Amino acid sequence: MGNLKSVGQEPGPPCGLGLGLGLGLCGKQGPASPTSEPSRAPALAPPPSPPPAPDHSSPPLTRPPDGPKFPRVKNWEVGSITYDTLSAQSQQDGPCTPRRCLGSLVFPRKLQSRPSQNPAPPEQLLSQARDFISQYYSSIKRSGSQAHEQRLQEVEAEVAATGTYQLRESELVFGAKQAWRNAPRCVGRIQWGKLQVFDARDCSSAQEMFTYICNHIKYATNRGNLRSAITVFPQRASGRGDFRIWNSQLVRYAGYRQQDGSVRGDPANVEITELCIQHGWTPGNGRFDVLPLLLQAPDEPPELFALPPELVLEVPLEHPTLEWFAALGLRWYALPAVSNMLLEIGGLEFPAAPFSGWYMSTEIGTRNLCDPHRYNILEDVAVCMDLDTRTTSSLWKDKAAVEINLAVLHSYQLAKVTIVDHHAATASFMKHLENEQKARGGCPADWAWIVPPISGSLTPVFHQEMVNYVLSPAFRYQTDPWKGSASKGAGVTRKKTFKEVANAVKISASLMGTVMAKRVKATILYGSETGRAQSYAQQLGRLFRKAFDPRVLCMDEYDVVSLEHETLVLVVTSTFGNGDPPENGESFAAALMEMSGSYNSSPRPEQHKSYKIRFNSVSCSDPLVSSWRRKRKESRNTDSAGALGTLRFCVFGLGSRAYPHFCAFARAVDTRLEELGGERLLQLGQGDELCGQEEAFGGWAQAAFQASWETFCVGEDAKAAARDIFSPKRTWKRQRYRLSAQAEGLQLLPGLIHVHRRKMVQATVLAVENLQSSKSTRATILVRLDTGSQEALQYQPGDHIGICPPNRPGLVEALLSRVEDPPPPGEPVAVEQLEKGSPGGPPPSWVRDPRLPPCTLRQALTFFLDITSPPSPQLLRLLSTLAEESSEQQELESLSQDPRRYEEWKWFRCPTLLEVLEQFPSVALPAPLLLTQLPLLQPRYYSVSSAPSAHPGEIHLTVAVLAYRTQDGLGPLHYGVCSTWLSQLKAGDPVPCFIRGAPSFRLPPDPSLPCILVGPGTGIAPFRGFWQGRLHDIYSKGLQPAPMTLVFGCRCSQLDHLYRDEVQDAQQRGVFGRVLTAFSREPDSPKTYVQDILRTELAAEVHRVLCLERGHMFVCGDVTMATSVLQTVQRILATEGDMELDEAGDVIGVLRDQQRYHEDIFGLTLRTQEVTSRIRTQSFSLQERHLRGAVPWALDPPGPDTVGP
């Protein structure tokens, strides 16, 4: 803390937010301007010795060639020279004149803020507002955008109408951080981006002020792990008094004037102590009595509030080797929180904006305890040390001061309370200067305040010239509220009675923690392909509403630049395909990868490569990331905070361990948010759909909720709320739901667009053809669709098409027969839910559920709701409450609560909802339950099997028709929802669909590069588009591309050799050089798979194409095949390239980064059941191991011998 004033308040704030934040300007040069004279070394410093040769690593000497002159700034220690161009942006003159330097004044009158009877002229306010708004939009890289211009117009209109304007919350956050960044007297500014801003502009009374302040202290103290924070109360308004905090700091020790003129306690606080006594405080008589707060609402007298003792963390001081030191009875408080300075942002003034950081040890050890006008313990300590105090040449003052500072550091570290020594603080400031020179071209700094009170030239800042000037936003000193024109409403008429004081203390205790819950905003982002992540995010939103102000957004609805101003973000996301983001998360992913701070805090510069590839390659186990994390932890308070310095975050990933890159996108988002400076509140959660995903999410959500309310101090009863949300005894409440008749019926295509939130169009069937032999027991079909040349259905070979199928009519009718009290068959309905009212708020009301469009119950079950997937444990819990037979109720409860039993039941039976109802016939089935609790029927994705150049206006699909029996082949027959529907279509039938691009699975632009294509079964689908496109290039464009190699696999040459004639024709026309086929069930032949072909016949070619000719390899098929092919290729590269297996793995990683090893992986098939069972067993063992001693949602990543990454 800065300690330069002997009477009245102490002017300076903490190290975490600066050594003083004062604004006295260096008078050697007058106000900072383009014409300022070059700065010189401090006048009282000794003449510098000849500087050493400049360090070649220092910034080069770069004076702007033309235009105005800028201050020349030299570092006398290393000889480096820079020019402060930022000083040209200063709009305010300093206090100095050409004949007088006032730079050493603590409170230059010219720079103190005083309440004015007349508001600032609109032109002046508008000028400052425009400058600030431009700063803000430049910071988010939107300068000159339509949003920027629109915001300027809004501010101008508001000023014209009201004479002032209001900041948006994001602008307030930015402005508060910039004010800290611009504070010339602050040595700890490297952490400016980590300032937590609490918006208290809705405060209306002194009691509410106290509530905010208590929560500020609790949050910032954080049990000794201090966090920088600011609470901003309402701005100054014309014709109204100010909100003011009379105390100079939120925590201060009283100073009692004695009859002999001496002071017991802190002499700096005598005046505020006497004011507190006048307002009814009953003082103690100790040296370290914590003062109450005097808080003033506009035009009201100040009110007295005593801080609850449990809120103020204090540190008893002891010495590591001098045992007698503890007997001195010294102590100091942990949290330095300046409360009497004014915050100015864009011309708006906030007279009450307390801010806090952490101490630099010399603020306590040298200034507070040793200054003659403070506690003045220097000589007492020197005597105890047996030092000669009779002569200054014994340096007794210096020796005693060092030991006192050592005691302070030792005591705070022993108590685990954040503190920084002056050497570390000044070294971090030098790094901050370097950062700011690169980012802004300069940094305002007051040399007299930056250099610490001891060690002078032993610190690097002593040798650094500095330029002092005023930038906006800024912190400013202001006159005491009980003096002069600021004293309106401050008169003291009487002392408060004991009862009134007791009531004030009672209010102090009761108000703590009651407001923050409504004020801390939480943003919940989801990325989802199937809707499950969205459902989980909505559950999370309901949970966080118990203690926060949450909003739930899809990633594609969220502006990523808002992350810099967020307080708490929770991410729930799935991973699509080959480790990619879900489609509605792609824009978020790209923007997140492009984000950087003022100084990029990433562990390494980003290379120019696909963000999808980057997401697949980032992991928490990355050694570079681990090294960066370790370094960041060691220098938490002395290093740059990063772009997301104030963000706290938690991430949960959904996935399946059957797929490579399990939860890859979630892991990458988790790592990237930390790289950008965010603080992880909870380790990454992962939910495996093969084993206990719902339980994993429930456990993670409760843990995330607890970590969040502990971090933001929003109330101790939040844990009970979490248990209520995820309680296994939740019941279906019929009275909370109803169906309402709707006038308008369903239009299918707009309805699908509403449900899936994506653009969708309708294609028409041209033909459906079975590609397998009539002797085959299975079917694979070629579906030809007419696109009508619609722009929305334009595609490239390798892309995917999404199809929205209906459920089978027979299944729908059987389910309808089980619904109790259904609505009339042809009547469109909507579900309405009874929203609870709140005390003082709106009464209970019926609100329509927006998930589905108005439609009949039959239409909902046919087109929008998933009735074939096994019901989730949550749905089974609800069904158990609707069962009339107690035995069925108990069985359903057991299934819903025992994860292992549920997974075994689901895996063996794979039951549809109808089969569950047949197994538990006493369950009643309300229509609203179906419409609100069933998951959405998701689109099915297929690789496009054609090229637009070969078949204009058409899209072809290659689809395996799925039919199988559950229960080891003895259960009911199940059909693939989409494949069965497609197989039954006739020419002219409509097909709702959309295109999903796959830019990472396309032939290289250079046709001369060799390519190897590997695709068994329907994995050949995208390659048909490849060869059709190449044929078109050969015959229409005259190109001569390099012949490709195709490796295909099927069961039997006479049954399911798909597209054999087409492939042979393409080979004869020069598209393929080699075509090899693996038969797994060919009579009188051994089983052969595509990976066997690669190993036995193509090993040399694989190595040559990938390592020597910069060629490409494409793999398409199910997850088991793709993993086996990958392992085979790795072994081939190791053998043919004479390298270790790990080295070959690194080569494949490079190939993926270069987008030369491509994978198009689709879901589980019947053939993968054995492998999937093994993965489920591994998942169960992981879960059980964690249940014995850890948490089920933080599953370990699979080992190198498992199918997962």
Curated annotation (Swiss-Prot):
Complex and partners: Homodimer. Interacts with NOSIP and NOSTRIN. Interacts with HSP90AB1. Forms a complex with ASL, ASS1 and SLC7A1; the complex regulates cell-autonomous L-arginine synthesis and citrulline recycling while channeling extracellular L-arginine to nitric oxide synthesis pathway.
Modification type Phosphothreonine: residues: 497, 1177
Residues with Phosphoserine modification: 116, 617, 635, 640, 838, 1179, 1181
Listed Pro residues bias regions: 44-54
Binding site for Zn(2+): 96, 101
Source superkingdom: Eukaryota
Known cofactor(s): heme b; FAD; FMN; (6R)-L-erythro-5,6,7,8-tetrahydrobiopterin
BP GO annotations: arginine catabolic process; negative regulation of blood pressure; nitric oxide biosynthetic process; nitric oxide mediated signal transduction; response to hormone; response to lipopolysaccharide
Binding site for FMN: 528-530, 532, 574-575, 656, 663, 689, 693
Residue sites binding (6R)-L-erythro-5,6,7,8-tetrahydrobiopterin per the record: 104, 448-449, 462
Binding site for heme b: 186, 477
Activity regulation text: Stimulated by calcium/calmodulin. Inhibited by NOSIP and NOSTRIN.
Sites of N-myristoyl glycine lipidation: 2
Region described as Interaction with NOSIP: spans on this chain: 100-488
Source organism of the structure: Canis lupus familiaris
Cellular compartments annotated: Membrane, Caveola; Cytoplasm, Cytoskeleton; Golgi apparatus; Cell membrane
PTM comment, free text: Phosphorylation by AMPK at Ser-1179 in the presence of Ca(2+)-calmodulin (CaM) activates activity. In absence of Ca(2+)-calmodulin, AMPK also phosphorylates Thr-497, resulting in inhibition of activity. Phosphorylation of Ser-116 by CDK5 reduces activity.
Keywords: Calcium, Calmodulin-binding, Cell membrane, Cytoplasm, Cytoskeleton, FAD, Flavoprotein, FMN, Golgi apparatus, Heme, Iron, Lipoprotein, Membrane, Metal-binding, Myristate, NADP, Oxidoreductase, Palmitate, Phosphoprotein, Zinc
Entry protein name: Nitric oxide synthase 3
EC top class named in words: oxidoreductase
